[in-house]
Amino acid sequence: MEDKTNVMRILDQKKISYTAHTYDSSKAISGTEVAAYLNQNPDRVFKTLVTVAKSGKNYVFVIPVEAELDLKKAAKAVGEKSIDMLKSKDLLPLTGYIHGGCSPIGMKKLFPTTFQKEAEEYNTIMFSAGKIGYQVEMNIKDLAKVIPYKTADITIDNI
């Protein structure tokens, strides 16, 4: 791989094993399309969402690409009354990442991070490497060496 993202450099520095994946990002591509392009089960490919609580605090939630964040469950998981999605225009100044290239690793500031609980069921999961067109695949337990996180049921149940 010719380019390493900041996420990959952080993982290298901490000597954490990961596999880098790339995809053609020249056209708009959804998380579900990324999973298909990389021939991965979309349940194992995660997206990073940044929220703001009524208290003004920011929280990061990482959920499967086909799932939808349940704002009530997410708020409860972090002990807040309510949360909303961060506005797209606020993402880059707050995190250093753009929409579609946001990673739970390497944000400008460390925010409380919660993964959908099923993330622990897989040997490895994939998420953005901090740049559109780049993904990292790693064991979620190794992630604790980089960022503190917890898991909870934070997605809308599809019945």
For the regions a language model picked out, list residue spans one by one.
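Extended, low-hydrophobicity, polar/charged segments
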Residues: 1-159
